[in-house]
């Protein structure tokens, strides 16, 4: 029978609930259990697809094309699984589903209420996550903080699930903060006590409490928390700040959270073999070289907007014993002199995905500088589109070439709308989303990066595409179309001939990178950047 773990948070946000949930998932997977994981977000947006990166950070795209919370990236990277559309549920999505059912008459004229209709819909989403994957364990993170009005329907739903499936099949893990008061020279447990009291007032008794802390927590303090929160002191778990995220699963194993979980469910599972993971942590802590990458974007004040890109660069660095240092370069503020000054300091240039016209000229000029000065360049999604525009302008001679997204009246729309996108009016959920195959061309850097694979599969999130009207004209000047859709219609990867490493792709390879298995194009890019640094 499927087991359900619910991870809640108290006191403050950004405690690391997502990392805790992902780490526990990794430990249980390494014990031989199949695991899936999901996140409930209490905001009323249907999904984060149309939200500003300043508000929400990056949008993580799943294999089946769902636009989701960035925590799903942590889940996939830690547990090494592919998630799906059931893995991120928002209040907006729940209410949309219930309202559609009401309009269809599914409720037979009854009054539609938060309880039972909204809570039943939430419970259905939990159960679907398990049914879709056949997982032994479903881990659900509840976004927000206990006490928030927005989270109440979710907390009520997970309270009810204990009655639906039996108390032996449900476990509640509560994450809280134990602050250190510098003036008093001591840590305080009161916030944790009050947070658990609030949770218990909603009918949920935590089975384990994870304490986020800067310093070691004494046995006496654990016993005090256990006493006031009515929990076994062995189930009070210390989670100290770590120098790398990938240390957290090891720390939680040392605190025996996975064993406590197995005991709670009555599961007899072998000890989790974490030797490979410990090797990863040891490697991360002892990198001997440094490579500098210039990331040119418009959301550089908020690194979470490019979280998966940053993690993928780091993963690739691990394979080269290299610590990747990122230089955040704001494309809106780049003058010609600044481009030379900033990019002369780096070993590689990356232009990631994005939307809109802000900062476009700075990105195009950065791409030109990388191309003309033989600096390794990697473009992703918008980065590929702008690399095409730059080449069309400065090599082919189409000085007014542009993307139709940025300038709908350009005489040379090198980048244009996909035909199926031309009559779409809604922004949300209407992009080309999810995993699609790409056929690679022999003798190209893209095919070399993928170890000679003929066809690869990567995730997409875009509305515009390379305009095939310009394909022959650009190919004649050394623009290489190294990957296309299997039917040859859509351009997926491009390169520049006779450049040490100038590769760009329409898809988002950052979504498939793993800490123990770097994504192929990122690995190729960092390898080229390491070589560039050597001179």
Swiss-Prot record:
Assembly description: Homotetramer.
Q: Where does CTP bind?
A: 13, 148-150, 188-193, 224
Q: Which GO terms describe its cellular component?
A: cytosol
Q: Kindly list the positions annotated as binding UTP.
A: 13, 188-193, 224
Where is the catalytic site? 381, 508, 510
- Spell out the protein name for this chain: CTP synthase
Question: Which ranges carry the Glutamine amidotransferase type-1 domain?
Answer: 292-535
